[in-house]
């Protein structure tokens, strides 16, 4: 296999893990593109992205254009004479002229099994929908949003205890291996391209804080999926006496209840059981305002009065029952 001259474009830690795999591979990373440095921390000092930091550690040229629609930025990229551009969570739109610049085009690492979940939040939407598996797709980029031909897929079962956080970590391990495998196939010309079936496509919209409000009229199983999908952000929550209480972990109880949805049925060290629109949800880890996430057992030691059986919890932040 002849090593490829690769431009890598990415920004967060997830992308940096893929860059490290390329650095460790037979291919040559000739340049890195990443978002401009952003103010961070209390002092609001400019901070380099994880991808930039890794590139500088390895003496790789770094480019940080504000936009790739700029003709000078496009000319700068073209002058690199890359074989291929690898894009992982970059954050900038790549116009067609950029997609067509490298000899073999641009490929993307996408955190789902396409075309099931296109868009910004495929990990979270897969959990919320109750999917039993997810994975990584290596895709040839085109001008659409995650609509390009699929080059390689890897599958990952979704376990009952998975959250968006744990799936992120698993896919961050799986993705780099898939990327290096795909590049080997591309270099050898042995990787067939597969068209996406548009009838199977869904759009994974970015999450919002509003979506994370718990609605007790939903089935317990749906709330359980939401809580896992919104961990670690924006975190499922409900309001009680003007306080936002975040819910980090839960389970679906074997109990049944005819009580009004939102009614606290029991509260002990094993969890807080709440009636829902269908079934009973047991909360096992929560976070009170200004505090860190704690087990229900620890929270009941200090605020048992907030979780008295018979209390009916509101489903929105503007109404208390």
From Swiss-Prot:
Pfam families: Formyl_trans_C, Formyl_trans_N
GO CC annotations on file: cytosol
Residues given in the record as (6S)-5,6,7,8-tetrahydrofolate binding sites: 112-115
CDD domains listed in its UniProt record: FMT_core_Met-tRNA-FMT_N (cd08646), Met_tRNA_FMT_C (cd08704)
The enzyme's E.C. designation: 2.1.2.9
One Gene Ontology molecular-function label: methionyl-tRNA formyltransferase activity
Enzyme class, first EC level, given as a word: transferase
Keyword terms: Protein biosynthesis, Transferase
PROSITE patterns in UniProt: GART
InterPro entries: Fmt, Formyl_trans_C, Formyl_trans_C_sf, Formyl_transf_N, Formyl_transf_N_sf, Formyl_transferase-like_C_sf, GART_AS, Met-tRNA-FMT_C
Catalysis: reaction(s): L-methionyl-tRNA(fMet) + (6R)-10-formyltetrahydrofolate = N-formyl-L-methionyl-tRNA(fMet) + (6S)-5,6,7,8-tetrahydrofolate + H(+)
Family: Belongs to the Fmt family.
Job description of the protein: Attaches a formyl group to the free amino group of methionyl-tRNA(fMet). The formyl group appears to play a dual role in the initiator identity of N-formylmethionyl-tRNA by promoting its recognition by IF2 and preventing the misappropriation of this tRNA by the elongation apparatus.
Annotated protein name in UniProt: Methionyl-tRNA formyltransferase
Species the sequence originates in: Shewanella pealeana (strain ATCC 700345 / ANG-SQ1)
Gene name of the encoded protein: fmt
């Amino acid at each position: 296999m002849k090593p490829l001259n690769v431009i890598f474009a990415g920004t967060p830690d997830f992308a940096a893990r893929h860059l490290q795999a390329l650095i460790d591979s037979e291919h040559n990373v000739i340049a890195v593109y990443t978002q401009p440095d952003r103010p961070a921390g209390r002092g609001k000092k400019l901070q380099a992205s994880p991808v930039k930091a890794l590139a500088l550690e390895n003496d790789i040229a770094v480019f940080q254009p504000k936009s790739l629609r700029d003709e000078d930025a496009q000319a700068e990229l073209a002058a690199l004479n890359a074989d291929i551009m690898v894009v992982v969570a970059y954050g900038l739109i790549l116009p067609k002229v950029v997609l067509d610049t490298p000899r073999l085009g641009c490929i993307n690492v996408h955190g789902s099994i396409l075309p099931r979940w296109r868009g910004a939040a495929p990990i979270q939407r897969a959990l919320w929908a109750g999917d039993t598996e997810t994975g990584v797709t290596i895709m040839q980029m085109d001008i659409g949003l995650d609509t390009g031909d699929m080059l390689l897929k890897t599958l990952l079962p979704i376990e009952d205890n998975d959250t968006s956080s744990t799936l992120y970590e698993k896919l961050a391990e799986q993705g780099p291996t898939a990327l290096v495998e795909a590049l080997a196939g591309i270099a050898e010309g042995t990787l067939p391209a597969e068209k996406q079936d548009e009838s199977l496509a869904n759009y994974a919209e970015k999450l919002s804080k509003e979506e994370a409000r718990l609605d007790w009229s939903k089935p317990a199983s749906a709330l359980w999926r939401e809580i896992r999908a919104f961990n670690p952000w924006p975190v499922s929550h409900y309001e009680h006496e003007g306080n936002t209480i975040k819910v980090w972990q839960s389970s679906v109880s074997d109990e049944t209840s005819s009580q009004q949805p939102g009614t606290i049925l029991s509260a002990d060290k094993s969890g807080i059981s709440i009636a829902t629109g269908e079934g009973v949800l047991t909360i096992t880890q929560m976070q009170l305002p200004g505090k860190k996430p704690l087990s229900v057992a620890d929270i009941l030691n200090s605020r048992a009065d907030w979780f008295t059986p018979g209390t009916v919890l509101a489903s929105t932040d503007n109404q208390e029952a």
